[in-house]
Amino acid sequence: MEKVIIKIKTENAAFEEVGVGNELARILKDMADQLEDAYNFPKTLMDLNGNKVGTVEYE
């Protein structure tokens, strides 16, 4: 069985500045755009401030 694992840490300033829901939505929309354009799983997820906050794995 194949699966996608998305891990996102919500402990930094970007999530406090715009709210957890807003920042999660922005990150997931960005990931979705990358998938739609090239079926390319981003390995690293970045917050609004350019910090690494998560990973995507395809198994």
Q: How would you name each of these model-derived features?
A:
Residues 1-29:
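N-terminal acidic leader/helix
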Residues 36-38:
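Acidic, low-complexity, intrinsically disordered interaction modules
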Residues 40-59:
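Short, mixed-charge low-complexity intrinsically disordered segments
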